[in-house]
Amino acid sequence: MYAIIETGGKQIKVEAGQAIYIEKLDVEAGETVTFDKVLFVGGENVKVGSPVVEGATVTAKVEKQGRAKKIIVFKYKAKKNNRKKQGHRQPYTKLVVEAINA
């Protein structure tokens, strides 16, 4: 069984036992998170939401908070001696999906 949830402005396909990386949530490691915005539940009994499946939830345990690898943003204008170098590390939350309740 799998489900498609919406979190952080993105839609993510999840299965029980799967580890996922999502946009940072304001929770501590070890806590349990419940997602109510379940858009689709697949498997033997397929349920499609409009826009969400009523009564369906996905529970996951927070494994850790972290920051992704650094990316470098470099802007310049030719012939103007105008240069800007900037780095960015996106914060994330790593979850392990425990159950899909549909």
Curated annotation (Swiss-Prot):
Pfam families per UniProt: Ribosomal_L21p
InterPro entries for the chain: bL21-like, bL21-like_sf, Ribosomal_bL21, Ribosomal_bL21_CS
SUPFAM superfamilies linked to this entry: L21p-like (SSF141091)
Gene Ontology MF annotations: rRNA binding; structural constituent of ribosome
Keyword set includes Ribosomal protein: yes
Species, as recorded: Bacillus cereus (strain ATCC 14579 / DSM 31 / CCUG 7414 / JCM 2152 / NBRC 15305 / NCIMB 9373 / NCTC 2599 / NRRL B-3711)
Protein name as annotated: Large ribosomal subunit protein bL21
Lineage: Bacteria, Bacillati, Bacillota, Bacilli, Bacillales
One GO location term (cellular component): ribonucleoprotein complex
Protein encoded by which gene: rplU
Family stated for the protein in its record: Belongs to the bacterial ribosomal protein bL21 family.
Summary of the function given for this chain in its UniProt record: This protein binds to 23S rRNA in the presence of protein L20.
